[in-house]
């Protein structure tokens, strides 16, 4: 069994796997439309780059149960075709965790500035949403430097601007 990661499963791999491949799935777009600290893709045009992990033989159900718990909060699974970056490897089926529009955490489309503000202010048991965004952006630059994920990198820029603005605000002193 192979599982496709396109958010924290790329940079926070806390489960056993036998093999991994960089590649993409088609017909989806990466968006920050989930009202939790998680980042999930939504069906649509385009493609989403990420990493497919082959779960260890004999441990598939155990690892899947862990991932089901980790990816809770309005997600369902579906099977999609994965296209490895290495074109000598044939495409194959992977399991995809995806946020659904009918879950209570789904926020839907919003202006990038609003999403950036949400990310800037959001924190939960798994940490700050800014960490999630920056780890994902750095991972994508490293894994697939040729992919210009406009949504992801625009959000990263807007959130960094907010952080810089906060630091500058904290450095302002009153004149004596």
Swiss-Prot record:
Catalytic activity: glutathione = L-cysteinylglycine + 5-oxo-L-proline
UniProt-listed GO biological process terms: glutathione catabolic process
Chief localisation class: cytoplasm
Gene3D superfamilies xref list: Gamma-glutamyl cyclotransferase-like
Sites where the protein binds substrate: 3-8
GO CC term, one of those recorded: cytoplasm
Presence of keyword Manganese: no
Positions in coiled-coil regions: none
A Pfam family assignment: ChaC
Active site: 71 (proton acceptor)
Quaternary state and interactors: Monomer.
Name of protein: Putative glutathione-specific gamma-glutamylcyclotransferase 2
Source organism (scientific name): Bos taurus (Bovine)
